[in-house]
Amino acid sequence: MDQRLLVTEEINAGSELIQRLNATLPIQAAFWLKDAYEGQWYLYLASDQVTDGTIREGYGEVIESYNQKPDVYLTPLQVKLISLDDPLAKEALDIYERYPGYAPTFLGARTFGGISIEEGYLYPQSIMAPASSPAS
C-alpha cells in the first residue's frame, strides 16, 4: 500500500484549482481522500451542477481550469467530480454543518461516506461557492 502523505503543495494546488473552478463550476464541498483499499490520494469536488448528464462538461471545466495554471502537485487525473447527492459529498456537507468555520479538517482512518479511508483532508468551507438557488 502507498504510504505517501498528502503534502502542503498538493493541498495548495487543490485550493487554487477550486478557486479557479468556482467561476464556471461552483464547488460546494472539496476534500482529499486516501482510500484504504487503493491507497491513492484523490481530490473530490462536489457541485450542485454535476449530474450524470453534465459530468463530461464538468471534467472539461476541470481541465480548462487546470490548464490556466498547471501544477506539478496536481493533475486532472487525481480529480473526481461528484454530485451533492453522492454519499461522500453528503458526509462532507454534514461536517461543514456540524463544524462551521474557516479551518480545514484533517481526517484519520475511518468510514467516510460509506468507504474506508486511511486519511483525508476537508477544505474549509470558506473557499467554497454557495449552492445555486433552484429556479423559480
Q: What function would you assign to each model-found segment?
A:
Residues 33-38, 47-49, 126-127:
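Short, flexible beta-strand-to-coil junctions
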Residues 44-56:
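A short interface-forming secondary-structure element
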Residues 72-136:
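Catalytic "initiation/cleavage/transfer" segments centered on a nucleophilic residue
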